[in-house]
Amino acid sequence: MRSSSTLLIAFGLFLASMSVEAIIRPGYGSGGHRPPSSYHGGHHNDDDCTTKPPKSTSTPSTSTSTPTTTTTTTTTTTTTPTTTTTTTTTTTPEPTTTKVKVCPQGYTSFLRTPAADNSFTSEWCMQLIWSPRQPMPINNASALCQASNTEAVVTTFANEEELNVFSLQMAQQFDRVGPATRGAIAVDGRRIAACVSRDRGILDSEECNGTNSFVMVDKHTSPGFTWSKWATNEPSANAWTYDIEQCIQFTVYPALTGPGDNPYNMLNRNNKFNDIYCNMDKAPNEPTNTAYWNFGALCGVLPS
């Protein structure tokens, strides 16, 4: 009996547990969830309310490694050597002949400072030419110069150096040849036309007073030096009958030679300039005084 009772009790408990589960889990037929198969003790797929994930089919991935072929292209640069041909041309230059300008025969070269008042002359050729006629009027001086050279003109000194050269020549000539121990030569310079007058008012005016009354005929010599070397009280513009002192002479009076010589003339006329008559060969007021005689002319020309 005990076994039967035990069985009955166990069965009753089973039923009780089933009722409780039915209450807790609604039935599948009324729209509830189907109990899992484990609930019924089976393994039917249709009884499982859990949606199982789809089976994944793994297709094994096959990696095919294609070998990469790297082609290396080697560029070879060939340098063609450049041959430079140097042609040497020998040019024989034409000989250049630079003509050196020289003074005519008998003339001496003197260097000068070029300036506007000497026509920018840098070299001037000069010669003292003695006249075959002694004394001679200054108006003959131009022809005397041109007889030695057709381009020559009557000229004068530009500086002390030139003066000393020809002053010495004159003194030596007078001492060696004569006919006098002192004398003069014709040089460039003329009284301007407006100052050729016997009227002392005109001659003593500012325009005609002293140096202002003279100009150089030839333009290759600056006049300043000559104008600074006038003898005492010269130019005097003396007049004589039909003539007036319009030309210039250069006098050398080296020494007193006799009791009749005038020391004043020696001191004040040696190596000095004096205005004199152009058409006379002697001073009419002192015809025997050789200091006023012209024995030649100072000539000048450009080198060529």
From Swiss-Prot:
Residues 51-99 have a biased composition (Low complexity). Keywords: Signal. Residues 29-100 are annotated as: Disordered. Residues 1-19 form the signal peptide. InterPro entries: C-type_lectin-like/link_sf, CTDL_fold. Gene3D superfamilies: Mannose-Binding Protein A, subunit A. This is C-type lectin domain-containing protein 141. The gene is clec-141.
